Amino acid sequence: MKKLLLIMGLLSLFGCGKKAPAYPQDKVVAKDGSEIVFTFFAHASFAIEHNGKHIYIDPVGEFAWEKMPKADAILITHSHYDHFEMATVEKLADENCAIICDKTSAEAFEHNCTTMWPGGIAKPFEGLTVKAVPAYNISEGHTDFHPQTREDCGYVLTLGGTTIYVAGDTEDNDDVLSQKDIDIAFLPVNQPYTMTVEQAVRVIKAIKPTLFYPYHYGQVEEKTDIEALVKALEGVCEVRVFPME
């Protein structure tokens, strides 16, 4: 069995001149030749840097946010505490920051934000397009965690001609399985709240990204078997694993 490679490389400072702590990073080349940099914090919180713009996804937790570059956009998938934390948003956002969030989270901003529903599209700044994708559970006994009626969001970001699917908290429902033209996928892999390893494999085989980053994976009730996930996708998709428990 091929040993699991836990990528810890590319530890570098996120941003220049900010004296920010080092967090794991990874870099990819977009279709237009530009560079996309991912910075991984933990669980569902990560950042994307592209052409000098900084995008934060579900930023929460005890990190040195005040030392990070200010956000050009913050995307919030839903209102659960491990995805949305107003104190963190306030540390990252200034008056020029675009807040893009689901309708439940929007209530905390008194709707002074871009409220997204599944199917909605936002263009917070030149060079970034965000499409909202439904995120919900379908397994018996698990639907209350992320009900379809709440209209939580995943997002498909387009940067430099490259599509990045951030699924949010969801299982392998038909809306997820029907995503097309995805280059890079972030899927949650922890039960009982999101996908099992088998569900994540099914989604990757259906949407066929070039690169898959498992995130939001389990240390809760069931520890995610990341090694089994990587093995199941050998020859199907490149999988890069970062510490995103």
Regions found by a protein language model. Name each.
Residues 156-207, 215-221:
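Metallo-beta-lactamase
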Residues 19-69, 115-180, 243-245:
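Core dinuclear metal-dependent hydrolase active-site scaffold
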Residues 1-4:
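Positively charged n-region of N-terminal signal peptides that target proteins for export
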Residues 111-126, 201, 205-245:
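Binuclear metal-ion centers of metallo-dependent hydrolases, dominated by the metallo-beta-lactamase
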Residues 13-15:
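C-terminal motif of bacterial Sec signal peptides marking the signal peptidase cleavage site
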Residues 87-92, 108, 175-178, 199-203, ...:
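A short acidic, amphipathic alpha-helical/loop segment
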Residues 61-105, 180-186, 208:
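Active-site metal-binding motif and surrounding structural segment of the metallo-beta-lactamase
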Residues 63-65, 80-84, 106-109, 120-123, ...:
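Active-site environment of divalent metal-dependent phosphoester hydrolases
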